[in-house]
Amino acid sequence: LMNNLNKHTEYLNSKDKHIEYLNNKVYFTKDNRLLTPNAQPVMMGWEDPIMKDAASLICHNKGKILNVGFGLGLIDTYIQSHQVQEHWIIEAHPDVQNKMKNDGWGKKSNVTCLFNKWQNVYDELPKFDGIYFDTWKESLDLFHKIVPNLLKPGGKYTYWSPNDLEVHSVFKTNEYKVENGITKLDYISSNQKYYNISKDLFNYKLITKKL
């Protein structure tokens, strides 16, 4: 019971922080950082090599790809380099949406931009060959519950979060994995320079749906 209460409290705290984030401005800096008004990092340019690896994973068959949370657009730029069939982006923050519009993301022939919270549009989404999820200060628990419904057979899903215990809670039980055909694999960036960053700080993982 206490574990359930603690999880519920963590979820509510995460929800409050995410709402606060969406209601405040963010700033894009010249040195490729995305910051909150009090200079908290939302996304940093040094994440680039990890985003490159993540894009390679989800673009495994150059099919239909979804990214939730645009940020600096690092992974979306790499997704475009794979010349995928369809590239969907969900972004909820108004300032990031404006940056995307100014940079012409909505004009790319294979890109569909959904300027909304994922909770408002997920039931209208098609199935994808690859999915990446990285929103700021938001619990991933709810999104992870719908991942199996959004993936095609053989599809791959990656995410990046500093709160590993909360993030992986949905996937801990064998019953869940058997029911949804999920195989969980540890994944660390192939770039040795970022090995310790991704392993120790972010616990970066790959989850792939079986054929």
Task: Report the location of each language-model feature.
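Class I SAM-dependent methyltransferase Rossmann-like catalytic core
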Residues: 15-62
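Active-site segment flanking the S-adenosylmethionine/decSAM binding pocket
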Residues: 72, 111-164
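Short beta->alpha hinge that forms the Motif I/post-I loop of the SAM-binding pocket
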Residues: 70, 91-94
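Conserved class I S-adenosyl-L-methionine
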Residues: 61-73
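Conserved SAM-binding loop of SAM-dependent methyltransferases across substrates and taxa
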Residues: 72-84
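Conserved SAM-binding motif I beta-strand of class I
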Residues: 86-91, 159
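C-terminal substrate-binding/active-site "lid" region of AdoMet-derived donor-dependent transferases
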Residues: 96-97, 139-211
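Short, conserved SAM-binding/catalytic segment
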Residues: 99-111
